[in-house]
Amino acid sequence: MLISKRRMIHALSYEVILLVIIAIALSFIFDVPLEVTGTLGIVMAVTSVFWNMIFNHFFEKFERKHQLERTVKIRILHAIGFEGGLMLVTIPMVAYAMNMSLWQAIVLDFGLTMCILVYTFIFQWCYDTIEKRLGYTPRHS
């Protein structure tokens, strides 16, 4: 199996919980209908998945060509490149859906990115704790 059941559950639970949090928070904070923020969240999540596949394909190709090791510096460049590229695509989406200027969308998108970093840390910690309690031990190869 190309993608394990465990990875599918992890990815889907991560995205669904994040989508619910973002849709409700944006709807409440900006007084925008939940249908708008929910749709925006879904479109951004799908965009992120596709961008992830495209970006990583070309990044790994570049890595192989230049025989780069995954040092901290390379990982930081990867993260900045991924998030920066994603923001270039999502900022116009946010501006349109939320009926705001590009500058406001940049600020909102950056804020969302920072919140998602915190969410990712908390989600992963909780997920690992649950797996540990269920007796799952990850194999590292």
Curated annotation (Swiss-Prot):
Keywords: Antiport, Cell inner membrane, Cell membrane, Membrane, Stress response, Transmembrane, Transmembrane helix, Transport. Disruption phenotype: Deletion mutant shows increased chlorhexidine susceptibility. InterPro entries: BTP_bacteria. It is a multi-pass membrane protein. It is found in: Cell inner membrane. GO terms for molecular function: antiporter activity. Induction: Induced by chlorhexidine. GO terms for cellular component: plasma membrane. The chain crosses the membrane at residues 16-36, 39-59, 76-96, 103-123. The keyword Amino-acid biosynthesis does not apply. Mediates the efflux of short-chain diamines when energized by an electrochemical gradient. Involved in resistance to the synthetic biocide chlorhexidine, a widely used antiseptic and disinfectant in both hospital and community settings. Interacts directly with chlorhexidine and mediates its efflux via an energy-dependent mechanism. NCBIfam families: AceI_fam_PACE (NF033663), PACE_transport (NF033664). Belongs to the proteobacterial antimicrobial compound efflux (PACE) (TC 2.A.117) family. This is Short-chain diamines transporter. It comes from Acinetobacter baylyi (strain ATCC 33305 / BD413 / ADP1). The lineage of its organism: Bacteria, Pseudomonadati, Pseudomonadota, Gammaproteobacteria, Moraxellales.
